[in-house]
Amino acid sequence: PAVKVSTEPSPEEKLYASMLPSTAKIMFIDSLVVDRDSFLTKIPLNKESGEIMSYNKFFNKAKKTSVMMSVYINEFGDQAYYAEEDTVRGNKLYRLDWLGEKWGKRTKVEGIDSAFHQINYPFVLSDGITLFFSAKGANSVGGYDIFTTTFDSDSGKFYEPQNYGFPFNSTANDYFLAIDEY
């Protein structure tokens, strides 16, 4: 008797084919391979996803901070998010708005409380309301973890940040998450 060979994909193959377009290309930048001072320059982003640079470069500071601090500038170049080092109260996140020909006064990012320590590496999705940052403290798996929150336009504050979870966080330090949607 002849064996009948099915050309119809199995349910598993159909599921795989339907899920494949949703996969993301993930790049890990290992701190053992890339040194601290050039870390931010190794993150490839399309212009539509904004720009990342060191705090010292953005603010034209010659003196290095004790910790590498970063600034995220949105795709339109009219908003910047950054953490500022505060050894007494812990780092805080701030936002600047471009007003005509210069940056306006800094505004503290509201909604991220003192449960987060050594906040750093902000990144805002192109939707303009989803913020990622790195911090130690509340709900950390180990060392620095990636947290995410969204902006509530009614209250003018961000919602309570949530740990972004595995596989983006680990028991080691996880510093930065940038999502290039383009």
Region annotations inferred by a language model:
Residues 2-182:
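Short, conserved micro-motifs composed of acidic
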